[in-house]
A protein has these predicted regions:
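Alpha-helical transmembrane segments of multi-pass small-molecule/ion transporters
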Residues: 1-336
């Protein structure tokens, strides 16, 4: 089938033209508060010992860091190049944004359910969340610009001028994630009993928060969403399988303990798409208009929808893996 027929079938233009809102300024602020609470909940389970584990157990942790910060964005870029005209520029940039975000907030919970290495999972979450202040804007800027250069040379869609306001992204992530992270760790240190009681309920709440965010985003664009559901589903499915494969393939190639393989698979396959949504809704980062005139970011529906659907699908795939691993009950391979 010709590429033009496929892209027409999946209706990418209507996807990019979706006008997505979160109920105005109030909705956007509520989104920020929701993610802040989620990050506070994650921090309740983080202890200084988790950072010490990076030194004590370097092989598994360094593998996880490389998978998430280096391999996932790089291989996402190669996947986008391989897809060519099947992806619109905004959809491609949405995939890059998701890959640039740190690990998802439910990864620790799913790792525990799948009988993975919970200590490794928490250590990776702690490290990747702490450094995402720098890695998220750097990865998005680097791979986003490389993609736009490639797309411009190959006449792929209507291309935006990608300007990455590093300071605005840095500031947003510090406020939304950095401050709650520090407060949560302080609470866990000084009030351990309270932190222990709040930890799991807040983890479960995070799932509800992400589902609610996606429902709000899709509710006002339901018909347009139905028109492109097949396209969205396939793109996110393939991208998520790539992420899961990076984690499992890398850890298997290095012959890590099987519990660690499960953990790295989940950590790489579950991304904090909620952070991506908040960045997309920030008019200082992605302005819809300048001086009364619409910008290219006024048509970033493809980015928003791909990022939002990731927030649903990675939970489905994560719990599916956890169920299969628990049911299979596979033992760790005997180490040399």
């Amino acid at each position: 089938m010709d590429m033009t027929v496929l892209t027409s079938y999946f209706n990418m233009e209507s996807l990019d033209s979706l006008k997505v809102t979160m109920g105005g300024g109030i909705g956007s602020h509520l989104l920020n508060v929701a993610l802040g609470l989620v990050m506070f909940g994650i921090a309740l389970g983080i202890k200084p010992a988790n950072f010490v584990n990076i030194i004590k157990n370097p092989k598994s942790i360094i593998t996880g860091i490389v998978c998430q910060i280096i391999l996932l964005p790089a291989l996402t870029f190669l996947l986008i190049i391989a897809c060519g005209n099947l992806l619109s520029p905004m959809v491609a940039l949405g995939m890059i944004l998701v890959a640039a975000c740190p690990g998802g907030n439910v990864s620790n919970f799913i790792t525990s359910l799948s009988r993975g290495n919970s200590e490794l999972s928490v250590s990776l979450t702690a490290f990747n969340t702490a450094v995402c202040i720098f890695t998220t804007p750097i990865n998005f800027a680097l791979w986003g610009r490389l993609y736009l250069n490639y797309a411009g040379n190959h006449n792929i869609g209507s291309l935006p001028q990608l300007e990455i306001p590093f300071w605005e992204i840095f500031q947003s992530i510090v406020i939304i994630m950095g401050i709650p992270l520090v407060l949560g760790m302080l609470c866990a240190h000084y009030y351990p009993k309270i932190a222990e009681k709040l930890n799991k309920p807040l983890q479960r709440l995070s799932i509800v928060v992400f589902v609610a965010m996606v429902v709000i985003i899709f509710a006002s664009n339901f018909k347009a969403f139905l028109d492109c559901i097949a396209y969205i589903f396939i793109v996110v499915l393939v991208h998520n399988l790539l992420a899961l494969g990076i984690g499992f393939g890398s850890s298997s190639a290095l012959r890590l303990p099987y519990k660690d393989r499960r953990t790295l698979t989940i950590e790489t396959g579950i991304q904090n798409s909620g952070l991506g949504l908040i960045l997309l809704m920030n008019p200082n980062i992605f302005p819809k208009e300048v001086a009364g005139e619409a910008t290219v970011w006024a048509s970033n529906g493809g980015m928003v929808v791909i990022t939002a659907w990731w927030g649903v699908w990675h939970i489905i795939s994560g719990f599916t893996l956890a169920y299969l691993w628990r049911k299979r009950g596979r033992r760790e391979p005997i180490e040399d």
